[in-house]
Amino acid sequence: MKPFHTALSFLILTTALGIWAQITHATETKEVQSSLKAQQGLEIEMFHMGFQDSSDCCLSYNSRIQCSRFIGYFPTSGGCTRPGIIFISKRGFQVCANPSDRRVQRCIERLEQNSQPRTYKQ
């Protein structure tokens, strides 16, 4: 019976931590949405790629970066398998980009130079 109790305890702990991570992520997402709405008057729809609900990670990069369509960005978390920059478009979509790509770096520089700071770091 001991393996059963161990497995049951692990399952309960995993479920509890998973719910906590979802609540934390939902709170952070609402904070980013509120910040963008206050600055741009936009209602943001968040789209997440992959199965990791507790953090935003890029599974692939978009090579077609059009900086004029973005209002902000934030880096992926340290828990992701690959580094990434997630740009937020004027329409509220998230676009993953390769942080070592020179076009991505120039876009970040432009966003930082525009009127108000618009980096949304988690």
UniProtKB/Swiss-Prot annotation:
<protein>
    <recommendedName>
        <fullName>C-C motif chemokine 9</fullName>
    </recommendedName>
</protein>
<feature type="disulfide bond">
    <location>
        <begin position="57"/>
        <end position="80"/>
    </location>
</feature>
<comment type="function">
    <text>Monokine with inflammatory, pyrogenic and chemokinetic properties. Circulates at high concentrations in the blood of healthy animals. Binding to a high-affinity receptor activates calcium release in neutrophils. It also inhibits colony formation of bone marrow myeloid immature progenitors.</text>
</comment>
<feature type="disulfide bond">
    <location>
        <begin position="67"/>
        <end position="107"/>
    </location>
</feature>
<dbReference type="GO" id="GO:0045662">
    <property type="term" value="P:negative regulation of myoblast differentiation"/>
</dbReference>
<dbReference type="GO" id="GO:0006955">
    <property type="term" value="P:immune response"/>
</dbReference>
<keyword id="KW-0202">Cytokine</keyword>
<dbReference type="GO" id="GO:0008009">
    <property type="term" value="F:chemokine activity"/>
</dbReference>
<keyword id="KW-0145">Chemotaxis</keyword>
<dbReference type="InterPro" id="IPR039809">
    <property type="entry name" value="Chemokine_b/g/d"/>
</dbReference>
<dbReference type="InterPro" id="IPR036048">
    <property type="entry name" value="Interleukin_8-like_sf"/>
</dbReference>
<dbReference type="InterPro" id="IPR000827">
    <property type="entry name" value="Chemokine_CC_CS"/>
</dbReference>
<dbReference type="GO" id="GO:0005615">
    <property type="term" value="C:extracellular space"/>
</dbReference>
<keyword id="KW-0964">Secreted</keyword>
<keyword id="KW-1015">Disulfide bond</keyword>
<keyword id="KW-0732">Signal</keyword>
<dbReference type="Pfam" id="PF00048">
    <property type="entry name" value="IL8"/>
</dbReference>
<dbReference type="InterPro" id="IPR001811">
    <property type="entry name" value="Chemokine_IL8-like_dom"/>
</dbReference>
<feature type="disulfide bond">
    <location>
        <begin position="58"/>
        <end position="96"/>
    </location>
</feature>
<feature type="signal peptide">
    <location>
        <begin position="1"/>
        <end position="21"/>
    </location>
</feature>
<comment type="similarity">
    <text>Belongs to the intercrine beta (chemokine CC) family.</text>
</comment>
